[in-house]
Design a protein with these regions (language model features):
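NAD(P)+-binding Rossmann beta1-loop-alpha1 motif at the extreme N-terminus of oxidoreductases
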Residues: 1-51
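Residues at the starts of beta-strands that form the adenosine-phosphate
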Residues: 2, 25, 105, 125, ...
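Short phosphate-binding/catalytic loops that engage adenosine nucleotides
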Residues: 24, 43, 124, 179, ...
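Helix-loop-beta segment of a Rossmann-like dinucleotide-binding subdomain
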Residues: 93-100, 143-158, 202-209, 260-268
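Active-site-proximal catalytic alpha-helix in oxidoreductases
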Residues: 187-227, 250-259
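NAD(P)-dependent Rossmann-like dehydrogenase/reductase catalytic/cofactor-binding core
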Residues: 217-327
Length: 327
């Protein structure tokens, strides 16, 4: 199996390097200064038990030659970049005829729950991955992975439901690469549970580590309410904690704890976009569809957009301004 990791950031970089270390044919897809750095000196994965540098093929797109028929595509870009990535790869030719969208399995190792339906519009064979993987990408050519003793837990299964041999094959490869990789026929139930956990990402990006507990619980409560109204099943915190146990903890790397989650990292890098529209915004969307008020999530969504627009540094959005958005 050949893996193409579309988005070699925190999650994609960790998965790609670990698969490459275990002998798999891996191609990393990146852009800008990060791609330049990977091409020049490889991708360095910093972790609690030491650093390693992967050197292999890196690209910014599918190119002109056909993809091998045994290729597995793993989509790891942020949700706001999904449509562009899908469009770029869907029509890539495959050895033996047909296109990537027609013939190749696509795995979505991303936060949020909107990526899988978007992928299924173009790709015939879509598989979801629920990602619990504490990692950070702030510097070109470098990813810091704090997960220990395993780098992450990756539940995977077919979208919208079920599981098949390709799930089991990819899970075996991920397990050999050090991950905990359960195959689940209800992977979206896990992804909706992870969505609830990710609703605090925007708060952390705005306020840093000093997020009021009541505000964090408020955005989650709104999320639980809209999922209940929509009849969407999800895992709860107790089930998730029991599943992870002590398999994926956090350890310092180079004496430093993980700085912040995925949305915080987007603001810290000055990325110009963040995934709050697909996290808090998903709750807002479901609330509007099912008549459930979601003012806290709407405020976080708007706050992140404002922080991006005004180039507010990560963690430095005024609490008073967020309170005003909350009304």
């Amino acid at each position: 199996v050949r893996y193409v990791i579309i988005g070699a950031g925190a999650v994609g970089g960790t998965i790609g390097v670990r698969l490459g270390e275990t002998g798999h044919d891996v191609t990393l897809v990146a852009r800008g200064a990060h791609l330049d750095a990977i091409r020049r000196r490889g991708l360095t994965l910093r972790r609690p038990d030491g650093d390693t540098t992967w050197r292999g093929p890196a690209t910014d797109g599918p190119g002109t030659g056909p993809l091998p028929a045994d290729t597995v595509l793993v989509l790891t870009v942020k949700s706001q970049d999904t449509d562009a990535a899908l469009a770029a790869w869907a029509d890539a030719p495959v050895v033996g005829g047909g296109t990537a969208a027609q013939r190749l399995p696509l795995f979505t190792a991303q936060n949020g729950v909107a990526n899988e339906p978007a992928a299924l519009r173009l790709f015939a064979d879509v598989h979801g991955i629920c990602v619990w993987l504490p990692a950070t990408h702030l510097e070109p050519g470098v990813v810091v992975a704090n997960g220990y003793p395993h780098p992450g837990m990756l539940h995977l299964g077919r979208f919208p439901s079920g599981a098949d041999d390709i799930d089991r094959s990819v899970a075996a490869d991920l397990t050999a690469a050090g991950f905990v990789a359960p195959v689940r026929a209800d992977v979206m139930r896990w992804k909706y549970g992870k969505l609830l956990a990710n609703l605090g990402n925007g708060l952390q990006a705005l306020l840093g580590r000093d997020v009021p507990d009541d505000l964090r619980e408020r955005v989650r409560a709104e999320g639980e309410a809209v999922l209940a109204a929509a009849g969407i099943p999800h895992t709860d915190r107790a089930e998730e904690a029991a599943e992870r146990g002590d398999l994926v903890g956090h350890r310092p790397v180079g004496g430093a704890e993980r700085a912040g989650g995925s949305t915080w990292q987007s603001l810290a890098r000055g990325a110009g976009s963040a995934e709050a529209d697909h996290l808090n915004g998903e709750v807002v969307l479901l609330g509007r569809l099912h008549g459930v008020p979601t003012p806290a999530n709407a405020a976080v969504q708007l706050g992140v957009r404002r922080a991006l627009r005004d180039r507010v540094p990560a963690g430095e959005f005024p609490l008073a301004e967020l309170a005003a958005l909350l009304g």
